[in-house]
Amino acid sequence: MASMAAVLTWALALLSAFSATQARKGFWDYFSQTSGDKGRVEQIHQQKMAREPATLKDSLEQDLNNMNKFLEKLRPLSGSEAPRLPQDPVGMRRQLQEELEEVKARLQPYMAEAHELVGWNLEGLRQQLKPYTMDLMEQVALRVQELQEQLRVVGEDTKAQLLGGVDEAWALLQGLQSRVVHHTGRFKELFHPYAESLVSGIGRHVQELHRSVAPHAPASPARLSRCVQVLSRKLTLKAKALHARIQQNLDQLREELSRAFAGTGTEEGAGPDPQMLSEEVRQRLQAFRQDTYLQIAAFTRAIDQETEEVQQQLAPPPPGHSAFAPEFQQTDSGKVLSKLQARLDDLWEDITHSLHDQGHSHLGDP
């Protein structure tokens, strides 16, 4: 029942958010057409008041039954003919809004609870993936330090070679170029398992999320499964893209360092300046590390963003929350209508599933 209540509360809140958009007139006209005349609405209201429930559960079941009929009329939001307005559309709309607010006030606590529980599980996923990104950053720092040590050109021995003559300088630079190729290749080999671990960790922990969030999400099992699969696919693709970008960074670093050790100046009879060469190496390595850190940080932010979107889809916050229905604050009424249609389709699926389960539950009662 709590799951169904959260779904219904979101439906009511969604309608409230939608009524503030540029397309609200068409929506209410459509409702006026499909809901029949005013007398029928008043009759439903009088029946509802006459059967005032003694408990919250009875009240919720009655509201759910009424909303099931109400939502059937919300399915088609486009393609209808010109609406036929009732005699008093303003009064009907006011009465409907009052009833919606009454039901929403009763059910809102369930929505807040579901939002909190789903959010807690998604935060658990973020914390589970954090060590993987920390490992990536630690590996970058470690391998950059290793490259720095292998490409030192300011020691006494290397300085003497660079300044000793063209042949000696050329031999040293060729050796440094070989080190660049070797150690950047080694970097790739050592980094690969960590990137693969991130991908496999995403798949494993998202499946754990699926199991842990299922008891709390108002969404139907089918929609929950779709949301989880989309989340897993998105994060996996982003993790693979991150690995590819780091590989590209390494290729670029190898090319830049190889050019730096190309022996500029040896053809003129003088070797390169050791201090200048060392500074260039340092700058190249620092730029590589900084760029890679930024890309890993961007991936971490993407995890936060994707999980927040899943929370909005599975258990949106109650009305009044700062994150409530941000997509409906746009000025483009066409986009708002499209998103509202998609959201109502999701709600319809969830409500149908919940009512189906509720019906089976009643059939099983002695």
UniProtKB/Swiss-Prot annotation:
Changing residue 19 to W: In allele APOA5*3; correlated with high plasma triglyceride levels. It is linked to Hypertriglyceridemia 1: A common inherited disorder in which the concentration of very low density lipoprotein (VLDL) is elevated in the plasma. This leads to increased risk of heart disease, obesity, and pancreatitis. Inheritance is autosomal dominant. Interacts with GPIHBP1. Interacts with SORL1; this interaction leads to APOA5 internalization and sorting either to lysosomes and degradation, or to the trans-Golgi network. Induced in early phase of liver regeneration. The modification Phosphoserine is found at residue 59. GO terms for biological process: acylglycerol homeostasis; cholesterol efflux; cholesterol homeostasis; cholesterol metabolic process; lipid transport; lipoprotein metabolic process; phospholipid efflux; positive regulation of fatty acid biosynthetic process. It comes from Homo sapiens (Human). This is Apolipoprotein A-V.
